[in-house]
From Swiss-Prot:
One of its GO terms (biological process) is thiamine diphosphate biosynthetic process. This is Thiazole synthase. Its EC number is 2.8.1.10. It comes from the Bacteria. 1-deoxy-D-xylulose 5-phosphate binds at G156, A182, G183, N204, T205. InterPro entries: Aldolase_TIM (IPR013785), Thiazole_synthase_ThiG (IPR033983), ThiG (IPR008867). Keywords: Cytoplasm, Schiff base, Thiamine biosynthesis, Transferase. Homotetramer. Forms heterodimers with either ThiH or ThiS. CDD domains: ThiG.
Amino acid sequence: MLTIADVEFESRLFTGTGKFSNSQVMLEAITASKSQLVTVAMKRIDFKMGLDDLLTPLRQAGVRLLPNTSGARNAKEAVFAAELAREMLGTHWIKLEIHPDPKYLMPDAIETLEAARILCEKGFIVLPYVHADPVLCRRLEEVGCAAVMPLASPIGSNQGLVTESFLKIIIEQARVPVVIDAGIGAPSQAARAMELGADAVLVNTAIASSASPIVMAECFKEAVQCGRRAFEAGLGRVQTGAVHTSPLTGFLNQ
């Protein structure tokens, strides 16, 4: 069981709502994934129309919504988006995203740390999306973040665990849950993230852009479960040389 702040999750696969062909496919894929935490960009919600077809089906499915501040270019904009989410959606959970560069969508470490400090002081449950920077993740813990969400590779790139060496350090040092976010493009990569000891992964593009999103969601669900079980079982130590599995006392007693 995974616990973030005061909430327990049976599923360690978090999902998103973007890039699906329509809301019905999105809902069916999320249902198939068994995800219990789904992120949604505040900029995609039309509050003038009330709770539209993006939010209503998700709430009916019983998943927890995690609004994000995607599109914010600085701490001020991110704090505004978070406060709007709390007022309109009735949640103090927020995925903090600040990426001023529209081409590569790299998170701004300085603005993210400042926004995290402000939001934690305001009583938010903050899950910041950041570079795989062990020092930054520790600083975010210190200001009160409930979890950290280091990237595996650029958002939507499907490149996999490009930052694996740094993710290992973050996982080793973290005192809050580590959710690997962005760039996971295949179930095998999600399984690998879990084998490293990550507490959860967030996957969106790899599911939504699949030719069969519902089947792919099921594949990710199973991969995350297997990866976590492998981590808990204890993976064998990696050796630089060969290690024999049978006695080296001669051949057939000769």
